[in-house]
């Protein structure tokens, strides 16, 4: 199927465009699909869609190591525009004197929102084998680091939110971290 501009000033069709077989492809990069608008405005253009996997790593904020099992360290992601959704079932293979924050990798760096923009993250995490903290309310909370491709864990007690560290959670072999996170990127 070929679509061509008819006439020197023709810019559109008078009816819907239906593609019954094949894909809609652009001849050059940096093009997008404009939704819900009659003009080509950046705010209404989807120019980035990607699905894929990344190798999740777990590092220690202060010292030591924590290694994930190679059979349980692949995360899946979908990126639509600036919104990223990730999920993974990560399991610990081994640890060696881990200390400090638990830092999990992400496939893309997160945005650093301006004061008038909510660019944060939202996520859930279920763990097996880890130690709940004194007065902990609910599960661990994945907290995406702005301007970086990683997240740390926090927990809440009755009055505040606190960091989860290797030291106070007591991680070991076969501990499991299942997470789903949504966050924004700069582009």
PLM segments and residue spans:
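Surface-exposed ligand/attachment interfaces on beta-rich extracellular proteins
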Residues: 37-45, 53-79, 89-114, 161-173
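Intrinsic low-complexity, repeat-rich intrinsically disordered segments enriched
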Residues: 1-62, 87, 94-96
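Short, structured beta-strand segments at or near domain termini in extracellular proteins/domains
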Residues: 173-187
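Substrate-binding and catalytic surfaces of secreted/luminal carbohydrate-active proteins
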Residues: 84
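Structured beta-strand segments within beta-sheet-rich domains
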Residues: 132-173
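Generic beta-strand structural signal
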Residues: 19, 28, 79, 144-146
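Short small/polar-residue motifs
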Residues: 14, 67-78, 134-141
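Terminal beta-strand-rich extracellular "head" domains
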Residues: 90-148
């Amino acid at each position: 199927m070929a679509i061509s501009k008819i006439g020197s000033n023709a810019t559109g069709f008078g009816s819907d465009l239906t593609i019954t077989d094949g894909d809609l492809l652009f001849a050059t990069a940096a093009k997008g699909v404009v939704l819900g608008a009659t003009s080509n405005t950046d705010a209404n253009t989807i120019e980035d869609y990607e699905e894929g996997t990344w190798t999740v790593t777990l590092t220690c904020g202060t010292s030591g190591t924590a290694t994930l099992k190679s059979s349980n360290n692949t995360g899946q992601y979908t990126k639509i525009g600036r919104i990223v959704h990730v999920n993974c079932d990560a399991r610990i293979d081994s640890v060696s004197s881990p200390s400090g924050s638990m830092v999990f990798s992400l496939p893309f760096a997160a945005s650093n929102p301006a004061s008038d923009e909510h660019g944060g993250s939202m996520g859930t995490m279920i763990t097996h084998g880890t130690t709940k903290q004194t007065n902990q309310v609910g599960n661990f909370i994945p907290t995406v680091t702005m301007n970086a491709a990683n997240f740390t864990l926090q927990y809440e007690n009755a009055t505040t939110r606190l960091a989860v560290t290797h030291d106070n959670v007591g991680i070991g072999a076969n501990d499991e971290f299942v997470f789903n996170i949504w966050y924004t990127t700069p582009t």
